[in-house]
Curated annotation (Swiss-Prot):
InterPro entries: Ribosomal_uL15, Ribosomal_uL15/eL18, Ribosomal_uL15/eL18_sf, Ribosomal_uL15_bac-type, Ribosomal_uL15_CS. Pfam families: Ribosomal_L27A (PF00828). One of its GO terms (biological process) is translation. NCBIfam families: rplO_bact. Belongs to the universal ribosomal protein uL15 family. This is Large ribosomal subunit protein uL15. Residues 15-42 are annotated as: Disordered. Keywords: Ribonucleoprotein, Ribosomal protein, RNA-binding, rRNA-binding.
Length: 153
């Protein structure tokens, strides 16, 4: 007995278009590519923003302002709640231990501690930045906070 659940509905699978097989086939000669020009050639790919050879919009419009990307500091964010689960009382939280415990990936240059979650253990925190609320929570739990400069690492 056939399993009718495996049969695709009518019109779901369309037949492949066969081109370049004689002019009487309807798609012979130019194979549906039109006549000559860049689009008719193999490997044709006009880049994004190409306007047929005229000066593209992104080059006609003047540049304004500046980008601060090169100078932006990128921080890996770790919340106080995550420190609660991973660290034992009295342990030191620094770049090395955060990478070892898998809370931070090694490629991010700076680390910042934020205040989401609760902390009950006293821990020593030595990272680049700590938010004011996170610092309060760490100190209320009996820990200490030391913000280090990137050059010291």
């Amino acid at each position: 007995m056939a399993d009718f659940h495996l049969i695709a509905p009518k019109g779901a699978n369309r037949a492949r278009r066969i081109v370049g097989r004689g002019s009487s086939s309807g798609r012979g000669t130019t194979s549906g590519r039109g006549t000559k020009g860049q689009q008719a050639r193999a490997g044709h790919k006009a880049y994004v923003g190409f306007e047929g050879g005229q000066m593209p919009l992104y080059r006609r419009v003047p540049r304004r302002g500046f980008s601060n990307c090169a100078f932006k500091k990128e921080y890996a964010v770790v919340n106080v709640g995550a420190l609660e689960f991973v660290y034992a009382p009295g342990e030191t939280v620094n770049r090395q231990t955060l990478i070892e415990k898998g809370l931070v990936k090694g490629r991010v240059p700076f680390i910042k501690i934020l205040a989401d979650g609760e902390l009950t253990k006293s821990i020593v925190v030595r990272v680049d930045r700590v938010s004011a609320r996170a610092q309060e929570k760490i100190q209320q739990a009996g820990g200490s906070v030391e913000c280090i400069e990137a050059q010291e690492r």
